[in-house]
């Protein structure tokens, strides 16, 4: 049934365009209504069109992803989210992210027929939970992969390379200002 949905979308048949030109419904709802038109024999139950559409757009309904981590003498073990160390969780997430980014870039090159250098940004929130070694590993990985790393943390992270910026909010009277203070890396350059 999902193949029929993809076929209807790729064929861009006129009979379905009314769903995607209607500003009163969301894209998720349009997907659900398209799915219902193609599969009238399937009972959707009490679920809303929004819920059905979100399920259709959720990649987890199309992929079964298993990740293994190498644990020294124990060898390769299946990664369970609750049993991963912070470093393993970051590494697992990074490996998935990098594969997605690389496939997007390859597809973009294929479609456009041009070798455009992408702007590769990696965003990391809650960086205060990471130790210095984990942060250094992220910096090294981003440097090797030609990515820029943007970190959000409640305290300063002193980089060996690159620049960190501290945002300081100041209120004077009825006006609020944000001061940006930059700290340049102090590590040795090669």
Curated annotation (Swiss-Prot):
Function: Plays a central role in chromosome condensation, segregation and cell cycle progression. Functions as a homodimer, which is essential for chromosome partition. Involved in negative DNA supercoiling in vivo, and by this means organize and compact chromosomes. May achieve or facilitate chromosome segregation by condensation DNA from both sides of a centrally located replisome during cell division.
Protein name, entry field: Chromosome partition protein MukB
Annotated gene: mukB
Superkingdom classification of source: Bacteria
InterPro entries registered for this protein in UniProt: MukB/SMC
Location(s), subcellular: Cytoplasm, Nucleoid
Tagged with keyword Iron: no
Alphabetized UniProt keyword annotations: Cell cycle, Cell division, Chromosome partition, Cytoplasm, DNA condensation, DNA-binding
Subunit structure comment from the entry: Homodimerization via its hinge domain. Binds to DNA via its C-terminal region. Interacts, and probably forms a ternary complex, with MukE and MukF via its C-terminal region. The complex formation is stimulated by calcium or magnesium. Interacts with tubulin-related protein FtsZ.
Molecular functions (GO terms): DNA binding
Cellular-component GO terms for this entry: cytoplasm; nucleoid
Organism: Haemophilus aegyptius
Assigned protein family: Belongs to the SMC family. MukB subfamily.
Keyword Cytoplasm: yes
Record note on domains: The hinge domain, which separates the large intramolecular coiled coil regions, allows the homodimerization, forming a V-shaped homodimer.
Paired cysteines (S-S): none
GO BP term (any one): cell division
PANTHER family xrefs: CHROMOSOME PARTITION PROTEIN MUKB, DUF4476 DOMAIN-CONTAINING PROTEIN
């Amino acid at each position: 049934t999902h193949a029929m949905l993809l076929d209807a979308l790729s064929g861009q048949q006129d009979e379905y365009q009314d769903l995607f030109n209607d500003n009163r419904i969301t894209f998720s709802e349009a997907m659900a209504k398209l799915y219902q038109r193609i599969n009238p024999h399937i009972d959707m139950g009490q679920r809303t069109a929004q819920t059905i559409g979100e399920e259709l757009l959720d990649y987890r309904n199309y992929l079964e992803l298993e990740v293994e981590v190498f644990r020294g003498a124990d060898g390769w073990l299946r990664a369970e989210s609750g049993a991963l160390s912070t470093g393993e969780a970051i590494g697992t997430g990074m490996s998935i992210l990098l594969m997605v980014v690389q496939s997007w870039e390859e597809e973009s090159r294929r479609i456009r027929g041009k070798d455009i250098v992408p702007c590769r940004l990696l965003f990391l929130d809650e960086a205060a939970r990471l130790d210095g070694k984990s942060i250094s590993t992220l910096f090294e990985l981003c440097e090797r992969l030609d990515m820029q790393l943007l970190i959000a943390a409640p305290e300063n992270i002193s980089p060996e390379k690159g620049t960190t910026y501290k945002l300081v909010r100041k209120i004077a009277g009825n006006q609020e200002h944000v001061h940006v203070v930059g700290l340049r890396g102090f590590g040795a350059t090669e």
